Each structure stands twice: as C-alpha cells, then as structure tokens.
C-alpha cells in the first residue's frame, strides 16, 4: 500500500492495488424464538391463473413497488396489476382449505389481456412508472406505462427482441437503467430513456445485482469470482472466490450492505446438466470486505436444502430487511427452486456476526403452498418484501402478553410455479415488545412526497419529471431504435450511437422540451468556476450569506429542483454534474497527477458522444468532504466525516446504519472498527484491543472518565495531571516494562483510584519515576528528611527507634484523635511539615483507601477477571510512596542500588530466647511490619530459606496509625499457619506486661489478639506473648529456623492422554450409512469424554498447587523486587494463557456437544431416509407429511375424502337393502346376513326338490319302458303326492317330461340370480 496515500487500496485504476487477504470461517446455526412467520390467512392461497405452463428456472413473475403500493404479476396471457392493499385484503378474506382462491378483477386489480403471452420476468422501474415484462417464448422485452395498465390498456411503449434473457434487473434508484443478462453469459445495460443497449459490460457472467442505491453493480462469473462495476464499465473492486470452492460459479448475489454480500455458488456441471434430476450442491457464503482489502468468507452451507421440487435446477431468490432495532442489523430471507421452505440469515447489531436462524416452533416457519395438481411440493418463482400494510395487528405476541396491538409489520410474498400467492407477516418479538416499528414501514407512510424516499435514512432523491419522460415517443411510427440493428450485435463500447440523440418531445403536445439531452452538459445547475457565482441562484463566495437557500460553498453546487433525465441525474449528495461540468478543485487534482487520486478516484470523464455513463453519480460524489455538493438543509446521511477522514472510492455508500457510518469515520484511524456508539469520538488507548471498552488487565489507575490522551500530560495517582516532559527517562536497572498491565508504558498500574489522605503531603514531592512498574524511588535527601522528622511512609519504610514512653503515648493519642488527624492531613500542603501524630492513611468514609475489616471487591492481584469498570488513568511519575497501592505500601521496593541502605541493624538486640521462637498465624503480607531492607514474603505467602534475621518495628507506632475497626488483617489477607511454638518451657515472658498493656489499651482480648496480629509464644505458654530482649523492649524479636518437616511437595500433574491415541470407535449397525454415522457419533463422544478427563486432571493439579501448604524457606527482600515482578508477570501470563486455553476448550466442547446433537439428528434423518427408500408405505407418508398450516389443510382434505368414502359405502348398503329379497308383503328389508341365511335355506330346499325330481324321473323312465300308459292306478301313492306337489296333472309321459323340464329350468334360473346378487354385494362390501 502507498505510504503517502492511505487510500491507495481504493484507487480505481488499480482495483487490487493494496493486495488482498482471504480468510474463511463457519457461520453457526442458532435456534431462536424471537422471530416468526405468520400467514395472512392460515391455509389460504390466492390463485392468479389455473394454467399448468412449465416455467424456466430463472423466472421472476411477481414484483411490488412499495412507493406506489402496487403489485404486478405475469401469468400466461395476462398481466395482473393492482393495489397491494386490495391484494392483502383478498387473501385475508379468502376461504380456508380450498385449493386456491381465484383473484378476481376489480376496480383496483386489473387483468390485462395479452394473448399468447408467456412471461418469465416482470418488474417495476424504480419509481413505479413503468412495468418491464419479458416473454420467454417470443423473446420480446416490453415496457408498459403503469397508469395505462391500471386503465386496462395493453399498449406497450417499447418492445424489442432479446434472445434468451435470464435476468432483467432495473436499477433501484435510477429510473431508466436496467441490467440485462442472457444465456450467453453476457451482461448489458439498457437505457430506457433511449431504448439503446451498449456493448456487453461483462462476459462469462452468471449473475448480477445492484447495490442498494444503484450506484454500482456487482457481477458474478463462472470462475467463482465477482467484480464491482460502475454503470460506465469501470471496475471498482475484484472479489476472489472462496478458498474452499473449486469449479463453482456464482449463481446468485444479494448486495446487503456496503461491504456485505450474500452469495450462492453452484457446481459448473449444473450449467450444462439437462437431466430430470440435476445436482443440488449449492453453497452459501456471506462475504465481508474489510477496509484494508481483507476478504472474509463466512460459510453458511445452504439455508434452503433441496427438499422439494428437485426436478428444477437450483436458483435462489433473496429478500432482505435492514436496521430493525433493537438487534437486527440485516435479515435475509431466502427461497430456492428445489426447496419447499424459506431460509433465514441474520446479522446481529450486538454481536456483529452472521448466523443461520432456525425457528424452533415449526408452525411459525414459512413454506410454499403444496401442489394438489401434481401431488408434490411447489417451487418458487418470486420472493418479494411488502412494506405497504396499514392495519394494526392485535395480540401480535400472545393473547396473554403485552402489547395489545402493534403497528403494521413487513410482509413477505411467495409466488410459486402454479401461479399461487402466499403471504407471511414477519414478527420480530423484541421490536414488538419495545414498540419499535420497522423503519421502511414508516417511510412508506410518507410516500406522498414528490421525491424518491430513501427507506433506511429518509434521504430524498430527486426523480425525473413526468414531462421530461423519455417514453413519449410516438410508437405508432415504424421506425424503432432496434429497427436497423440487433439489440446485441453491432455496437462497440464507446462508439457514437443514437443513444446521444434524446427524445425530447412533450408528453401532451409533442413540443420540444427543455430537458437536457443525455450525455450533454446542462447549463442549468452547472458547476461554476471556483470563486465565481453559479448560473442559478448566484451562490456567493465562501463566507458570505447564501442566496435562495444555496450553500455558502461557491463550487460544486447543484439544484435540487432541476428536472433531470438519465444522463443528467444527480443525487442530493452528488458532486459535479455530468459531462465536462467538473469542479475546478477536481480538475486541479486530476491535472496535477495525471489521474484521479485521493479526492477524485474516478478517471476523467470523456466528452465523446458515446454512452456517457459517467453522468451517473459516483460513490465519491455521495458526500464530498470539500463541500463540492449542495446538501439539503436536513442532512440525514449516515456518512459524516471528521477533518482527517476520507471516503473510500471503491465503496458504495448504500448503508445508513450507525455501525458502518462509524466504521467509515475510523478509516484513517489505527483503532479497529467496533459496533459501539462511541466509535469516531474519543477513542481511548484500549479500544483497539478490547473494542468497546478498554480492558487493561491490572492497571489500577485508569478510568473511562478521563480521556485526555494529551502528550506532555501525565496522570498522578490523585486524579490530577502534572506537566512533565513527553519523553520519559529510560528505566533504571533494566526494570521490565509493563509487568502487570496491558496498558501503555505511560499509564500507572498501581495507582489508587481514590485519592488518599496523604495527597496534600505528596503533591509537590515529585520523585523520579520508574515509568513501567509504577514504583516510586525516593532520593536520599527525602529519606533523610523523613528519618529526621520521624515521618512514617506507610508500612514499608524503616521507622526510627522510639523510646517506650513516647511510643505508648503516641499510640494512645493517635487512637483518640484519628478522625481529627485525618481531616487535618487532607488539608495540609507540601510546604507544611506533618506532625508525628499525622496518620498516613485516611480511613474515613469520604475517602477510603485500605479496608482491613472487609474483603475488597477487587483485590489488587485478582486473577479472576481484570478491572474494567472503575479504573482511573494515572501516571506513574507522580506516584508517591504514600499511596496505599504502591509497592512501598506493601514493604516492597526496587533493587538495592536505588534504595538507601538502612542506617542501623538490630542484630545486637537478639535475645537469648530468640532461637526458640517461631511465628504463628502470620498474614501473607509480612512486609507491613518489616524493615524495607529485609526480604519480604512472596505474594503467594511462601517463604524462602535464608539465614535468620531480626525484624524490628515499633509496635505502638504501628498500632497508632491503625484504628480499632480497621486492624483485622485476616479479612483481607488469607491466613497461613506457618509456625509452631517454642520448645523451651521454662522461659519467662518479659513482655507480658507490655502485651497486657497493649491489649487493654486497644480493647482486645487475648484470643482476639491472636486473630488480629502476629505473635510470638513459647511451647509451654497457652497465651500469645510478645518476645523481646532487654535491649529492645518495644521491638518484635523474630527468628525463623528452617523446618523441613513442614514442606510438602506440590501435587504432581498426571499424564494427559492424547486424542491421537484414542482408539477408533466401532459400530454394530449393519447398514453402511447408519454404521458410518454411528461410528462418527461414538468417536465424538469418546473424544469429548477424554477432553473432560484431561480438564479434570488439570483442574485437580491447579487446585493442588493453590492449596498445598509449604514452609517459606527464604525471606524476601526489596532487592528481590525485580525477580518477584518477573515471576508475577510470568504467572499472570500463564494464568491468562490458561484462561484463554480454557475458554477455547470450553467453546470447542460446546461446539462438540452441538455437533453431537446434530449428528444424532442426522442419524435419525438417515434412518428415516433408509426406511423411506425401503418401505413404499413410509415414503408415501413422508410425501403426505407437511408442516404448519399446510398440514392442517391437507388433514382436512383427508377428512373430506374419508367422508366421501363413508358416504359411498352407505349408498351401496342402501342399494343392497333396496333389493328386497323376501317378504314383499310387509316390505321387510333384510340385511346381508339374513340374505345369506335365506340363500342357504333356498339352496337346501332346491337340493331336496332336485332329489325328488331325479327319483320321479327314474320312475317315469322305468314305467315308460313297459310301453304302457301311465294311469292313476299304475302310480304309487308317493308318485301321486309328488305330482300334486309339482302341479302335474295326469297325462301322458311326454307331458310329464316337458313340465318337469320347465320347472327345473325356472328353479335353476332363480338360484343363479340369487347367487349373482350375493356375489355383487360381497364385492361392494
């Protein structure tokens, strides 16, 4: 990057001048309940056509213009246009659980007939004045006036042939600019003002998208890369492909924010795949472009997995919401041609990170309507956001929860391939509970303004006047811009075309208008020469009052009321006008460097007669820091720069959110951007490390209230600044820098956050500072003065010898006059000499420093968490040794070389009894009662082995400065039983009377004294005694002998097992896929158990290290300060590293647990899939299964079918009843069972009758053989009976035979009829 220009990375002539760094991360899935979708009418859809026409994958057949509250839909043979409010009402009033409610024609909804039209794309222009439609059969692109369509007029104002268009994308702001993309992977720009197309803007392009303001477009290519273009064809930025993808093309792009893109990639093989089952392997990435050319690819997989109409190739539809407080910075809704559900991505304001939202309640998700015709899922052909709703919603959250109602909510419309519409309201619970409306809903309410409204920041963008509309050409003429050449063939980029010859006839009279011709400079509102008045309004010279509301800047002004055409379009934040109308400042910069640099990133605008896209506002014209644009009186733009910040040229200023605005303000800052509200203001030194809040780990002297980071001013421990030199002296004796703090070296680390009582005494005593450690070194003269005046400096300085009487009297006096002395001490100046009775610490309620009877809320060396809330910025150079948080307050000084040697040692005062005495219940900060020349104990309470030495401190003097209620050291410092009693049982207690006197004076009992201060006592005495010699009756006599039996070794660290040594898991499942998932699940579980085992071992080791008692074998001295500091810093680094390690491990464990849950769910899913593949019945059940309102509708349909079946069975039963098989006289209606019984009986009777006939036949044949006439006499009585039963009279044999045959046939026919009837009844049953 150019060191002279920090914005060299943004140089438009070198899109990748700064290089690029590419990283890839994973976007996590989040289960949420704060967001939900609710249908306008559960189970209701609106049908716009009953056609079954097949549509291409790249269809977009529904659009909404929120400014005009209009919708348009393309269906076979019709364009349907009307009011969105009536469309919402028609769906709310529709019938439930009906295949589709037909949208009827009305006064506000028109079905414009267009015979043989088969549309694949429809859309509005940015201001809603025109409707653009494309017929994928005839390849005709048609433009209609919206007003004409509302009057049911099918006359187009423009029509041209464009073969194989797959994308028609109007500019969201510029009303007459449209992107066209065809199957040849070419991208063109169509100007609706001239109906002309230039040479391809880009080739090998697979998708395109406008920025939210339409100043730039981004084009994706078949190699996976993307590029940002201006409408003039200038490349602003090149975006590489994700590192993990190869042989993928850019399938869909949505430009969400300035530097945020949601992009879908698909395999290259799907471009040429024409099979019925194309591959569905799309990948979703959220691309974040950093200020320094860094690209981060957040992988989100595919939020809309292919569980739907899988016969269609992947094509995604994206709609988004922005800046919905309190936490939704961006909400992206995604639909996929191969998915039946909608996916959701969100960017959080608080976390500043993307996530895939998984709505926990399945009934609150959004899905496409089910296709009853095909008995399968439908596929989307459009996804649109609607901000025009006006009805308030009652009980939006829950019938029992507040609020009772809420403002209208955004609506997302989904149009499927069966021309059915379904709509869902988007409920954001956090915003509803706080009564926060979606901002664009409020903007639409004010849409009656004459200018285009910017939804996200209420900017007013001027739109072309109706009289200056280019669509006034008499289209009845046979001449057409496309009559002489093809739309795509014979143009060269930059070649002079009819594009420059504007249509300037008036709409009503056909007269020539004054609207400037596209590509020619406009004299009206032209930028004047610097220092000269403008042509309109006579803007005065800088500093004089402006005329006609003009800016006081005399250059670069523009007229907000000017009627503009496409070629002369200006944003209210734009700079110079089109063509040659450039500011002198920009010309000067351009001519000096030969190319635009720093203030003019774009190249010089050409004055040729070709297609002049330079007239479109550039990004760097959005907000000129030099005042080259006239800004409206109420500037609502989110981009406001300080004097030392510049706008990046390659950034499209489409985002008005606070976050990105403040990132822009920090473009020239060394501090990393943050989402907090204090960005761009006073940024403290810790902001780059801890983002929103500075978090120095152990800097006790810093406060967030003090923000004067002024060189040359240092901060004292008393909260006041002291003028010092900017350059600090080099630390003496190689003292380590920043031993306990992550703060800069000029910040104090051990300064008190509250002024102490000795502030007045030490304010003028400026000593040489050790700037990195916060240790104050006293000069020898200062020590001599302190020694002469017997002035005590905390608990760390050597106290001069005092006689018995003076010490006792001073102790009693100091206890009696403590509060009075505190007040007098606070008022003293450095010139006054403190008295001997003046205490060093202020224990009053007004200015507390040390509190010994209550644990501190944040101990000085707490490793739990750093102090971040109540720290004050202090400088070390003014740190006095009287500060209770300085090292001297703990009896610790720097190395021996800068510290004056003590003038007297008390080795001669060692009594004969000293060898038998040891310390009991000694607090871990022993330096409070030790001489500064002796070795102090470690901060963790351990002691090192050193030769026995004498420690002498005036007891009465020590007790004098500590009030009664503050003398409990045990509540502040943990006790450690480090001593035992002496073995000499015959020794007397020479100081018993002294001890009793002290205890009685202070009101302590002997037991209480054992808990308050350190004592010396022989083995034989049950009391705590003070042991002294005759020579030093008022000194503690102490000797510590080495005791090896007290030392306990630290708890050893057990060996940790490695994940690499973990054996592979095995599964007993037989199915291969289930076996694989089972092994993966078990492997994760074993690894997780091993990780927990290792963590427990480490925790046990740490607990053992902190709780293992050990004897102090060596006494610390002030000379060991540097070593102790280094050890403490190393320990701090270790603890910090371990804390970070534990945090990382915890995150990994949480991630593993989440993975286990997902694997378990995936296992169940795979099991179901295998079952579905092997069980046709289960597969049918899965096809019938739908979620949410769709399931209710289908369930009702199933119930209706069941009712029909039952009704049919009832009808059949009625028909069987009507058969009336017997007892016709009483009209008895037999049942099926009774009929079967009757049939059995009839069959039995027929069998008996048949036997009788056979017997009769046999007798007749026997009689006939005798050739005799059968007479009455020749017949037996049985035969006569049979004849009578059969109704046969006496006749000849022939007559008998004929009658027999007729009777037999009749009975056989009757039996066959009954049998057939029963058979039919059984089949019906």
From Swiss-Prot:
Pfam families the record matches: Beta-prop_NUP159_NUP214
Q: Where is the composition biased (Polar residues)?
A: 763-778, 792-801, 816-835, 850-861
Q: Could you tell me where this protein is found in the cell?
A: Cytoplasm; Nucleus
Q: What GO biological process terms does the UniProt entry carry, in alphabetical order?
A: protein import into nucleus; ribosomal subunit export from nucleus; RNA export from nucleus
What are the Phosphoserine sites (modified residues) in this protein? 1041, 1043-1044
Q: Where is the composition biased (Basic and acidic residues)?
A: 779-791, 802-811, 867-881
UniProt keywords (A-Z) are: Cytoplasm, Nucleus, Phosphoprotein, Transport
Region Disordered: start-end pairs: 1-20, 453-474, 758-951, 973-994
* Name of the protein in its database record: Nucleoporin nup146
Q: Which organism is it from?
A: Schizosaccharomyces pombe (strain 972 / ATCC 24843) (Fission yeast)
